[in-house]
Amino acid sequence: MAHSIWHEKIKSFLPEHYYGRINHFLDEAYASGLVYPPRENVFKALQVTPLEETKVLILGQDPYHGPKQAQGLSFSVPEEISAPPSLINILKELADDIGPRDHHDLSTWASQGVLLLNACLTVPAGQANGHAGLIWEPFTDAVIKVLNEKDSPVVFILWGAYARKKKAFITNPKHHIIESPHPSPLSSYRGFFGSKPFSRTNAILEKEGMTGIDWLQ
């Protein structure tokens, strides 16, 4: 399901048998209709970014709900897929902040310790937030609580009102929070553009004696 260390830590914040409930939910959801991402990618964020290597969290709300977009990493799409509006704005801010990045797959961020997590890990095709409030929030809240317990600093990048509510789980003074409006077209001009989250994250990591992220990779 997830990287084994993630699995053990997350379980400690969940009711007994919650993983069984998740598997039952997934069985029913994927049997009853088209759901994104592909089932094998539901836990991809936790599989490609081990807990011990995580130093940044970028929290999304739920996966893209269009064909072939969602790949299990928040905001990321496969390279051959056109960038959705929020990702276009993320890359625009990155270009203004650090430099241009012309590819849409953010897997190279994940491999450097950037956990690209959505609060909901699945979505019905064409129905934004269609699985919100059903199963995922206790699980992904537990992921944030696990990160909060880390001894090494983590930079939490929280875009938009939904993500910013998760600050309640970030109580360890070792960690850092970067927050702004969401990169969606509705709110990007209300403070997302110009917020410089990428250079600010690297400045924090380097001040903490950690290696910065190569955001252009």
UniProtKB/Swiss-Prot annotation:
Subcellular location: Cytoplasm
Any one cellular-component term (Gene Ontology): cytoplasm
Keyword line: Cytoplasm, DNA damage, DNA repair, Hydrolase
Single GO BP term: base-excision repair, AP site formation via deaminated base removal
Active site positions: 62
Keyword Cytoplasm tagged: yes
Annotated SUPFAM superfamilies: Uracil-DNA glycosylase-like (SSF52141)
Documented EC number(s): 3.2.2.27
InterPro entries per the UniProt record, alphabetical: UDG_fam1 (IPR002043), Ura-DNA_Glyclase_AS (IPR018085), Uracil-DNA_glycosylase-like (IPR005122), Uracil-DNA_glycosylase-like_sf (IPR036895)
Catalysed reactions, semicolon-separated: Hydrolyzes single-stranded DNA or mismatched double-stranded DNA and polynucleotides, releasing free uracil
Origin superkingdom: Bacteria
Gene Ontology molecular function: any one: uracil DNA N-glycosylase activity
Pfam families per the UniProt record, alphabetical: UDG
Function: Excises uracil residues from the DNA which can arise as a result of misincorporation of dUMP residues by DNA polymerase or due to deamination of cytosine.
Family that this chain belongs to: Belongs to the uracil-DNA glycosylase (UDG) superfamily. UNG family.
Alphabetized HAMAP family for the sequence: UDG
Protein known as: Uracil-DNA glycosylase
Upper classification of the organism: Bacteria, Bacillati, Bacillota, Bacilli, Lactobacillales
Gene that encodes it: ung
